[in-house]
Amino acid sequence: MASAMTCSAAELFPHLGSSANATAAAEFICSRFSAVSEYLTNTTYAVDTTYLLFSAYLVFAMQLGFAMLCAGSVRAKNTMNIMLTNVLDAAAGGFSYYLFGFAFAFGAPSNGFIGKHFFGLKEFPSQAFDYSYFLYQWAFAIAAAGITSGSIAERTQFVAYLIYSSFLTGFVYPIVSHWFWSGDGWASASKTDGNLLLRFGVIDFAGSGVVHMVGGIAGLWGAFIEGPRIGRFDRSGRSVALRGHSASLVVLGTFLLWFGWYGFNPGSFLTILKSYDHTIRGTYYGQWSAIGRTAVTTTLAGCTAALTTLFCKRLLVAHWNVVDVCNGLLGGFAAITSGCAVVEPWAAIVCGFIAAWVLIGFNALAAKLKYDDPLEAAQLHGGCGSWGIIFTGLFAKKEYVNEVYPGFPNRPYGLFMGGGGKLLGAQVIQVVVIIGWVSVTMGPLFYLLHKFKLLRISRDDETAGMDLTRHGGFAYIYHDEDEGSSMPGFKMTRVEPTNTSTPDHQNRSVNVVV
């Protein structure tokens, strides 16, 4: 916020001469001046709140991107199921984040581990937080839950989605965001009392670790405990591709996520009307400029990762694959999210280039270990997110670090930028801590769901598809009466379970023209 302007009648009076009305004139001028100053202050709050709300809307729109990406990446027989789980992530996550999540994350005053106030938004808004901030943070929380849903797609019971989504957004994710983003967190770069990890905290500006690693590691445990989908690996252990049914939806979802990322990364500044030191660059330069730079670094990282994936996969598999390119693009975005505000544009290109190789490498490792993740979510968000945190410890620029995190003139910065290895050490600790925390919380949860037979659907249901067996029908309309139609198209075969006794679910297959 801009500093308030002040006016004193006692200071102004000597400048008005010795007229009889000088005192009254000074008081009148100062009263008008105070009114204008208050108006400007209110305008600043309004502009900053509007900026934050707009960013929240962009981040929330990423849920549509996740939904389209997930729908296109699964087989047609599970489309309705995965779409419903994405709606559930937002709805259940909103309720749990309102009751507990926001309080655990930002309920100040608190200790370094967990927040203690604002349960159910009680005593809200406060001087520190407004409702717009809650909305923005909720959008981040459900993004983490959406990442996890992709890892366990096509084989997970609906009740398991409800349980894990509420637990992740209401407890697991908020604790991590408290550690690294709250003003009281033990590793937060925004903490002011100096009682920090290595005395300066970690830099995870928009959440390569807080959001992407949390969602990715949670998905890793879910997919690992469930096991691969039926048919994903043959009897000899070789990988069998279970292609998603719509590359068009994958591309649509990717572009929606790309658009939303401009609220995710630049929006994490929270305010836009903030001046920087004018002696360095002049009055034209302020937080609005840093926001623009953040959008540029985000763009370059994603574009570089997409192009790198395109040509690398062409060399590896001898064809151009749009789905691989989309995943590479998103991997670049996940990686740059940590350091987007504190690195140069050229460094973002380095980030995206290596992120593409990280994703390719983790995908190869997953296939070798017979790990099945339909959306590559654990590899993309967990793997590339981890690289993004390390990248920040290598390439964070001193000037930008001091702009984004003022008040600590001797704060360490990137190793390759001359800042030594302290920040890199803190970033490595963040990676280890997030992996540990999510593993000891989400791992046991998925294991308990598995033991109580609440995690994976039956083999027959999985073979037939959950749209038919769990959700009352297909996501796409099948017109049996059009079977003999001369309309151009291709035939799809509907397969239903063989062990049901109802007349409507007897074993049959119907060829339908689409």
UniProtKB/Swiss-Prot annotation:
Keywords: Ammonia transport, Membrane, Transmembrane, Transmembrane helix, Transport. Pfam families: Ammonium_transp (PF00909). The gene is AMT1-2. Ammonium transporter probably involved in ammonium uptake from the soil. SUPFAM superfamilies: Ammonium transporter (SSF111352). The chain crosses the membrane at residues 52-72, 87-107, 133-153, 158-178, 205-225, 249-269, 290-312, 316-336, 342-362, 375-395, 428-448. The lineage of its organism: Eukaryota, Viridiplantae, Streptophyta, Embryophyta, Tracheophyta. Induction: By ammonium supply or colonization by nitrogen-fixing bacteria in roots. Down-regulated by glutamine supply in roots. Highest expression after onset of light. One of its GO terms (biological process) is ammonium homeostasis. It is a multi-pass membrane protein. One of its GO terms (cellular component) is plasma membrane. Gene3D superfamilies: Ammonium transporter AmtB like domains. It comes from Solanum lycopersicum (Tomato). Root hairs and leaves. It is found in: Membrane. Belongs to the ammonia transporter channel (TC 1.A.11.2) family. The keyword Transmembrane applies. This is Ammonium transporter 1 member 2.
